[in-house]
UniProtKB/Swiss-Prot annotation:
Gene: rsmH
Highest taxon listed in the record's lineage: Bacteria
Pfam families: Methyltransf_5 (PF01795)
Name of the protein: Ribosomal RNA small subunit methyltransferase H
Classification of source organism: Bacteria, Pseudomonadati, Myxococcota, Myxococcia, Myxococcales
Function, as annotated: Specifically methylates the N4 position of cytidine in position 1402 (C1402) of 16S rRNA.
Chain coiled-coil ranges: none
Organism listed in the record: Anaeromyxobacter sp. (strain K)
Length: 310
């Protein structure tokens, strides 16, 4: 089945308001996906370099945005490598940078990608088509490490029994698919503790997806690279969908906008450091009730933005 990567960009109006794209400016979209946010920037007259490691998403969005001609360029790459991509293209800096850390609906819904717990699919979960699959990961790590992943990345309160059940099923059942994996996870969680609004395997699947794709490592690399990617006056925005990502963005943006680096017990600043970034959003921007009604997945979206001063 071929995926349709068309999607409505989350927090579209807010992105335009915060990034303020102007004709001729150059933006870096680190997560092209369906091309929704890139399309917004291009419609405003900006130029866009967009990254994605999913070849199918890349091809679909490139075809959809072809009408913008040379103003749009797509590169197959992980957004963690944004700085290296720009250097390879001979670009010193951009006027704005954006990442949308959500998983696209086609990736979630297409069973053969291995993200769905409602339909059987292979234990894959890779955003692209290279690297370690979910099955590779589950066979490589031990029960203790699996429990850590579920606890830290999925905030799963029953991480230990879930990890134990998953490792046992992996050894005794072959082949194990995503639908059966979801059943195993649900069976390891007491029925009275099942979440009310989501499938009991949701936290586990989130944690495993993050681990397979090293999503937090990619985000950390993107955040660390911002000072070397943005031109003075350039703005960066990040849309996150769970607390781990939002916490990382919040803490990094706070560090970038902090001037003094002296120990807190010093009565007077001795370092003389000046902040290189300014916060644009004082707190995370959330989707409106109208947008959530139109696009329920926007409910958990959190947007933060900063501007480079010098």
């Amino acid at each position: 089945m071929s995926a349709d990567f068309r999607h409505e960009p989350v927090l579209a109006n807010e992105i335009l308001e915060l990034l303020r794209p102007r004709p001729g400016e150059l933006f870096l979209d680190g997560t092209l996906g369906g091309g929704g946010h890139s399309g917004l920037l291009l419609e405003a007259g900006a130029r866009v370099i967009a990254l994605d490691k999913d070849p199918r998403a890349l091809a679909a969005a490139t075809a959809r945005l072809a009408r913008f001609g040379e103003a749009f360029r797509a590169v197959r790459s992980d957004f963690r490598d944004a700085k290296n991509v720009l250097q390879a293209l001979g670009i010193a800096a951009v006027d704005g940078a954006l990442v949308d850390l959500g998983v696209s609906s086609p990736q979630l819904d297409e069973a053969e990608r291995g993200f769905s717990f409602s339909r059987p699919g292979p234990l894959d979960m890779r955003m692209g088509d290279t690297g370690e699959t979910l099955e590779d990961l589950l066979r490589r790590i031990d029960e203790r490490e699996l429990a850590r992943i579920l606890r830290e990345y999925g905030e799963e309160p029953f991480a230990r029994p879930v990890a134990r059940a998953v490792k046992a099923a992996l050894e005794t059942e072959a082949p194990l698919d995503t639908a059966r994996l979801a059943e195993v996870v649900a069976g390891a969680i007491p029925r009275k503790a099942w979440p009310h609004r989501i499938h009991p395997a949701t936290r586990t699947f989130q944690a495993l997806r993050i681990a397979v794709n090293d999503e937090l490592g990619a985000l950390a690399a993107w955040l660390d690279g911002l000072p070397g990617v943005l031109a003075p006056g350039g703005r960066a925005a990040a849309i996150s969908f769970h607390s781990l990502e939002d916490r990382m963005v919040k803490e990094k943006f706070r560090a970038l906008t902090q001037a003094c680096t002296c120990p807190p017990d010093l009565p007077v600043c001795a370092c003389g450091a000046k902040a290189s970034f300014a916060a644009i959003t004082r707190k995370a921007v959330k989707a409106s009730d109208e947008e959530i009604a139109r696009n329920p997945r926007a409910r958990s979206a959190r947007l933060r933005a900063v501007e480079k001063l010098r």
